[in-house]
Amino acid sequence: MKKYLSIAILSVLLSLTLFGQNDKTLLVIENQNVPVSEFLDIYTKNNKNVDYSKASIDEYLDLFINYKLKLMEIQRLRLDTQKNFINEFQKYRDQLAQSYLIDKNTVDKLLNEAYTRMQNDVRVSHILVKLSPYANPKDTLKAYNKALEIRKKLLNGTDFAKLAIEMSDDNSARDQNTADGRLIPGNGGDLGYFNVFNMLYEFETAAYNLNVGEISLPVRTPVGYHIIKLTEKHPAIYRFKIAHILLMYPPNATAQDKESIKAKSDSIYKEILNGADFAELANLHSDDKGSANKGGELPWLTPFRLVPSFVQPIYNHKPGDYIPPVETFYGLHIIKLIDKQSPPEFAAVKQELLTKLYKDPRYLLAQKKIADSLKQVYKIQYDKKLLVNIAKSINKDSLLKRSFNESQIPNLDNILVKIDDNSIYIKDFANYIKKNQSLFTNTDDIQIFVNKMFDNFLNDKILEIEKENLENKNPKFAA
């Protein structure tokens, strides 16, 4: 295909001066000039929230050229109906359509919020009262009141870890044994350190709005109600690099075993302070065989998911420091801090944050806002009684056994909802329930489950219809 293409990419693409050159030719395909203005028009549609940087332009330019090549090839070979070309074209259209199906102000807000939160690492403890998103009002109130009672006990001075062990539905609060007999101490509700996108959005928001030492009111997430205590807050470590010497505890280690290992670790640490080579000592003594022959050096790490006692001293030391023995349930670690990096500037990390945002459930907020606005545009008609009848016809055991079948629901060929002139049938919704039946749990209320499934289903259908009509409704999209 390339022999039909003579590409003259102007140097203006490599700088911001591109945006003053929109009357010039960007590339030539089979003697057809493609102006800069055409590229700019499509680029800005998809990139209103992205800086006009060289990296951003280069990335989108490849996509644009591939699109023009495919389109020209289709026209040249008259393969408009050939499946593989249509699929390629549809992929491009779908990507372009996405920028019209999200609320850009919401994306901007979430992006800026994420970068602000990225500047600090927080350490939290929590006590969970488990509750399904589809619980009935009675069970919801019961769980909420239980969470309030837990908070009251904490405010009256009950030890957080003790109460977490007794009352939390998060099993990590309590001691557990590994398959090889090693005891993993419970965390007493201490979740360690985290940063933006490491936790459920509702949980993250609550944590970042607490002051150190403060205990939250009950916070609802998809897994239940949480009582959250913020125990530490530090300027964020974007990533850090260390070498360590691990002296591992044996399974079922006694107090004497631990004392012996402590004495050995103290001795090694003194050798290091007296000038001994860390890498040689790691190779000689470390029980972490994966890193011992590398001088104890580990890959780049982030604080998230690491044992808090392992991470805590990193905040208070600088590169080049040797950190005294640190205890985890594995044993004792002597740490050499090689490097520690703060979060990059916004421009450097923006694409990373956008990628994480698009994969995170909070991104649905931007889609939901568009769907809600479209509900005021489209004429939507449905009878809520149909949802009641659908819920009554579903066998609860079939949902729990993941064996629900559409045939349980009567009148599958009847219309469930009309969106303007588009008819959506009961069988379409029944199939949606079937695909999502794994979300249902034993304590769920079927009617609430059906209602929330319908809300999501309706939003999806509205966005699908809007997507199909973009050419008719938006001249710029059709261009």
PLM feature segments, named:
Residues Q21-V34, L40-A479:
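Peptidyl-prolyl cis-trans isomerase
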Residues M1-Y4:
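Positively charged n-region of N-terminal signal peptides that target proteins for export
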Residues I7-T17:
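Bacterial N-terminal signal peptides
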